[in-house]
Amino acid sequence: MEKRALIALVLSLLVLVFWEMYFGLFRMPAPPPNKTEQAAPTTTQPATPQTVPPQAATPQALPQDHVFRPDQQFQSWAIEDPLYRMNIIAPGARLSSFELKKHRKAVQPDSPPMQMVTSQTGGYLPMAIDLLHHQDWQLSTRPFFSEAGPKTVLEDKKPRVLSFSTEVPGKVRVTKSFTCSPESYLLDLEVQIGNLSSERLVDQMGISFYFLPFSPPEEESSYNPSQLTTLEKGSLKNFTTKDLSKSDLVLKPPMTWVAYENNFFINAIIPVAEGGYQFVPRILDATKGLLQLVYLTDPFQLEGNETKSFKLRFYIGPKELSTLARAEHQLASAVDYGWFTFIAKPLVYVLDWFYRYTHNWGVAIILLTIVIKILFWPLTQKSYQSMQKMKKIQPKMTQIREKYKGDREKMNQELMGLYRTYKVNPMGGCLPMLLQIPVFFALYRMLNGAVELRHEPFMLWIDDLTAPDRLPIGFDIPYLGGLPVLTLLMGITMFIQQKMTPSAGDPRQDQIMMIMPVMFTVFFVNFPSGLVLYWLVNNVLSIAQQYWVNRHA
């Protein structure tokens, strides 16, 4: 293989790896969707989107930011499920917490459960209802009452409905009904607005949701950002905190869902109606990343003693591919592996199948690596055989290079003639590497973003397959912390593999090939340990295959 071709290949691979590490190549924030419009800027509260019919009463502001002190005590109701524990408080019948029982906040065994709703928002709690023409009624903080007991346990696979009601005497009655299904992260909300007066009520309802980044701002990264995402006509649109800070947006239907998510978790809001609503996001605190997302209905009117209902569905939980698929609403689209999704998603299912029998995700990765190696075995075999043929004609190639070193064009002609005579493809040794690059990046995206592997141990010091491997050695190594043992082993096996590969006959090319293990070790040092494990096992299998080919050449 010509030196320039090899250099181009190596540089291309390194550029791709570098770009993915630092710039999130496969999941860049999308531009605003076609159905997104600019909201009119104001010096006080953001103005209501200019989509309200002229004849309708138009509110002059989004719902006010009703805040309570997080340390205040209120009457509350707990909903207990094998998957989660949810609490609803009396003021506004809002969610005060939603913790996932099967997922921890940190890798430590004593770490608290992952909180999808938390009072760390400073008292901004989701599902706060307001009537925009009558915000003085303070529905989002008015006490709601319920006949439900203080604790509801979901069992017997029967959905439970918990209803909460409040009244503004002589004006309006509001009922919020939550429908919870056992062992499901789906939650349904129905809001009923009843006009208690004899006069016509013309209004517009807003339901506010509040989100904080899933990780502290200093730990947020470009390849695992907390961001607002919409699914519109099968296409994902992403908006980071920085995007939302630049301008006021109005998100309009049709959309399948809008969500706040990162690689591992998602808070999805699923409109039940096909139209008659819009979403308005705005940043309340850029330092903390506090986001308010307001669901606005179209203006409506109620005659005396008339009632109107509004429905929403939610998915609050992990981005487990199989779980999202069962939840429908195209929620599985939220698991986005970029350009190589069509490769990565099948790999997730295969990995999950292996895990069901091994109960160890690290072992499942090893088995998956073996399967991939078997699939690529014929191509790799031809590649190694091609390199063996190249090795046999090395003396003739050297003679040609010496004879025509002053005439590069003639030298290349003679070399191509030599390749044809001995039926050797000079690029044959590169084919398996080129074909494995898409699989490599698909695995990288999968292992870096699969919640199934989050905080899952392999063995010994490897306690999180989505995090870099670090062996504590009693002191911190600069920029690393612990010792990346798995990564070093990967580099060593790659070096052994290069030593076993037949020489191309060009000393400069051989030097480049020997530098590759060092470069890969440096790049892999902060990659997920699950990905390093895959590459290490793949190297070991390649060494075994190369040894067999060398013995039978």
From Swiss-Prot:
Keyword DNA damage listed: no
Pfam family, one: YidC_periplas
Membrane topology: Multi-pass membrane protein
Transmembrane segments: 6-26, 331-351, 360-380, 424-444, 477-497, 512-532
A GO molecular-function annotation: membrane insertase activity
Annotated spans, Disordered: 34-59
Protein localization: Cell inner membrane
Entry's Gene Ontology BP terms: protein insertion into membrane; protein transport
UniProt xrefs under InterPro entries: Membr_insert_YidC (IPR019998), Membr_insert_YidC_N (IPR028053), YidC/ALB3/OXA1/COX18 (IPR001708), YidC/Oxa/ALB_C (IPR028055), YidC_ALB_C (IPR047196), YidC_periplasmic_sf (IPR038221)
GO cellular component: plasma membrane
Low complexity: compositionally biased ranges: 38-59
Keywords: Cell inner membrane, Cell membrane, Chaperone, Membrane, Protein transport, Transmembrane, Transmembrane helix, Transport
Protein's job: Required for the insertion and/or proper folding and/or complex formation of integral membrane proteins into the membrane. Involved in integration of membrane proteins that insert both dependently and independently of the Sec translocase complex, as well as at least some lipoproteins. Aids folding of multispanning membrane proteins.
Subunit record text: Interacts with the Sec translocase complex via SecD. Specifically interacts with transmembrane segments of nascent integral membrane proteins during membrane integration.
NCBIfam families, per the entry: PRK01318.1-4 (NF002353), yidC_nterm (TIGR03593), yidC_oxa1_cterm (TIGR03592)
Family label: Belongs to the OXA1/ALB3/YidC family. Type 1 subfamily.
HAMAP family per the UniProt record, alphabetical: YidC_type1 (MF_01810)
Listed name of the protein: Membrane protein insertase YidC
